[in-house]
Amino acid sequence: MGYDRLGPSGPSNPNQKDPATSLPELQKKTKTKLILFTLAVLVVGVVCFGIFAGIRAVDSGKTEPKLTRKPTQAISRTCSKSLYPNLCIDTLLDFPGSLTADENELIHISFNATLQKFSKALYTSSTITYTQMPPRVRSAYDSCLELLDDSVDALTRALSSVVVVSGDESHSDVMTWLSSAMTNHDTCTDGFDEIEGQGGEVKDQVIGAVKDLSEMVSNCLAIFAGKVKDLSGVPVVNNRKLLGTEETEELPNWLKREDRELLGTPTSAIQADITVSKDGSGTFKTIAEAIKKAPEHSSRRFVIYVKAGRYEEENLKVGRKKTNLMFIGDGKGKTVITGGKSIADDLTTFHTATFAATGAGFIVRDMTFENYAGPAKHQAVALRVGGDHAVVYRCNIIGYQDALYVHSNRQFFRECEIYGTVDFIFGNAAVILQSCNIYARKPMAQQKITITAQNRKDPNQNTGISIHACKLLATPDLEASKGSYPTYLGRPWKLYSRVVYMMSDMGDHIDPRGWLEWNGPFALDSLYYGEYMNKGLGSGIGQRVKWPGYHVITSTVEASKFTVAQFISGSSWLPSTGVSFFSGLSQ
C-alpha cells in the first residue's frame, strides 16, 4: 500500500540543514553513566559492573546454544519460560555467579546482563557521533542514541526494583520499564528501516551494536512474568478486587495533594513557575526557553503556563530528565503549538513530532498540538508521548498520518479531540483514551483510514491501546464522501498488536469489517483486537472480521482488564485529569 508506514517518504530537501541535535558531550556522559551503573549494581549486591563478560550472539533459539558449560537445573527451568531459550542460557552462563544462583537470583542476573549489553551498545554507537552523515541518516542515528539512553535508564530502574519487588504495583513498574526498553530498541531499528538504501557504515555499526537486545529484553519479560503469573498474557495488575462495576470520583492516589489542586484549579487561579507569552508579558516569549529553564529531575510539580497564541517552534521536546512538568494553556484552539515537519524533511517519524514529551510525570491540559504537513507528506506527528505516568487532558491533537504517537510507558488521555487519517493513533504505550472524540479526516485518493496502528512486539509486553467511552466521528469533509474512504478501527503494525474499543459510540463511517490487515495474514493469529458493548451505526459486529485474534468481548471480567484500574495499574497511579474519572467499566 502506498501509504504504508515504511512507504515513500516524499522528496528530500537539499537545502535543509542537518536536523541532528548536537551531542558533543555524549561520549563523556556515556562513560559517566557506566560508572554510575557500576555503583547501582553494587548497591543491589550484584557482581561488580566492571566485570563484563561478552554475550555471544545466537540464532534466537533456533540453533543449539554454543555452550562450554552445562546449564544448571535452575538455569534450564528459568530459560524454558523464554521465547529465546538458547540466547537465555548463553546470557546466564556468561555472567559470573550464575552457576550457583537460584531462580530468583537468575532473574536479577538476566536483568543485569541485559543492562550491561544496552550500556555497551550505547557506548559503541556513540563513538561515531562526529561522523558526517546525510540528514536522514543523522536523524535515525540520533534517535537511536536517545532511545538507547532512555533504555539504559529504564533497565537501571527495573534492575533496582526487581530486588525489592513485593507487590502488584512494583510488578507493573518492572513490566512497564522492560516493555519500554524493548519498544525503544524497535523504534531505533525502525528508524533505519525507514531510510531504505541509506545508512551505510553508520547503520551497520548501530544495528550491529544493538543485535540481540530486543530478544534479551524479551527473555527478561518472560522469566519475570513467569514468576509473577498474574502478569502473563493480558496483565491484571491489581488482583485484590474486581473493578468492573466500581465507579470512583476520587483523584488518583499517585498525585500529591498540591498536584490534585492544580489539576482542578481554573487557569486564572494557578500560580505558574513560568509564564510563556508571545507578546512579552510573561517570563519568556517561547516555549523552548521555558522548557530549558525547567529543573531536571524535579520531585515537585513544575508548572509552565502558556498563554493564548499560536506557537510555531522547532520540534519542541520535554526530555527524560525534565520530570514532573505540567503545561497549562488557555484552552483548545486558543493555546496552539503547531509545526509542519514530516518524513519528507529528511527526518524519521520519531523526529517529526511538533511536541514530544519523555519526562516522567508529564501533564498537559487545555492546549492544541498540530502538525499541518498534510496527507501528501505521509508520516507527520503532532504529539509524541513517551513519559511514564503521562496525562493529557482537554487537548486537541490535529494531524493526518501518524498524528498521535503514544510511544511507550503508561499514559492517560481524557476529554481530548484527536484528528487524523492513516494510523493516526499509533505506538506501544499502555494507554487509555477515555471520553475522547476521535475524528477521521478525508485522506488522499485511494487511501484507507485506519484509526490505530499498535506495535506490541512481544506477548509479555503490558502494552496496548484501550479506547473507552469515546466517540468515533467523521469530519464534515469526510462525511460528505465517506463512501469513497472506508474507515477501520485499526491494523496490526507488529505481531502482538493489541487494541480494545469499549462502550464507545461508533459512527456509520466505520467499515462493517471493522479492522484492516497490515500485509496479508500477518499477525491475524497473534494480535488481540476486542470490542465490548459499543453502540452507534458503526458498532455492528455481524460483518466483522473472522480472524483468530479478533474478540467480541462478552465478559465483564475480561473487559475490566482494559480499564484504568487494571490495564495501566490504577492501584499505583490511576491516571487522571483532575476531574471525575472512572477506574472501572462504569461511567
Swiss-Prot record:
Q: Which UniProt keyword terms apply here?
A: Aspartyl esterase, Cell wall biogenesis/degradation, Disulfide bond, Hydrolase, Membrane, Transmembrane, Transmembrane helix
How is expression of this protein distributed across tissues?
Answer: Expressed in siliques, floral stems and rosettes leaves.
Query: Where exactly are the transmembrane stretches of this chain?
Result: 35-55
Residues binding substrate: T349, Q379, R491, W493
Where's it found, cell-wise?
Answer: Membrane
Additional free-text comment from the UniProt record: The PMEI region may act as an autoinhibitory domain and prevent untimely PME activity during transport.
Q: What is the name attached to this protein's record?
A: Probable pectinesterase/pectinesterase inhibitor 61
Gene that specifies this protein: PME61
